[in-house]
């Protein structure tokens, strides 16, 4: 369920996907998969993730993830300049409402001291 990007994640580009039908009695750990290249200029990542429930409830989370060690070494897996990160989103979630759950992800990155957000986030090649 990953959405491929062209190496740039535009501020207005909201990545949306529907979750598959899941067992309503089982708890699920949810992750966001993200791949970045050396063109990514930040050591962290801020995301806004919204989950729309079938009966209309919306839960929105603002999340921050560490993307690099203090020395600049990328976190994640991969031997080339592409690193794959499995980012925690929610733990032990149950899906008790019958119907389609929709997840929307957008980035909320800013440069230090800048009030306006980064319009084009370079170095992100897919999210899901």
Task: Give short role names for the model-derived ranges.
Residues 1-50, 56:
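Start-of-domain marker
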């Amino acid at each position: 369920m990953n959405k491929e990007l062209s190496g740039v994640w535009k501020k207005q580009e909201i990545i949306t996907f529907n979750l598959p039908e899941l067992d309503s009695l089982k708890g699920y750990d949810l992750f966001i998969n993200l791949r970045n290249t050396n063109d990514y200029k930040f050591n962290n990542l801020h995301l806004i993730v919204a989950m729309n429930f079938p009966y209309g409830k919306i839960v929105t989370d603002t999340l921050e993830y560490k993307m690099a060690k203090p020395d600049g070494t990328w976190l994640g897996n991969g031997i080339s300049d592409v690193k794959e990160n499995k980012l925690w989103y929610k733990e032990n979630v149950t899906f008790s409402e019958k119907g389609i759950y929709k997840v929307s992800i957008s980035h909320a990155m800013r440069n230090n001291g800048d009030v306006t957000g980064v319009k084009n986030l370079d170095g992100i090649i897919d999210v899901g």
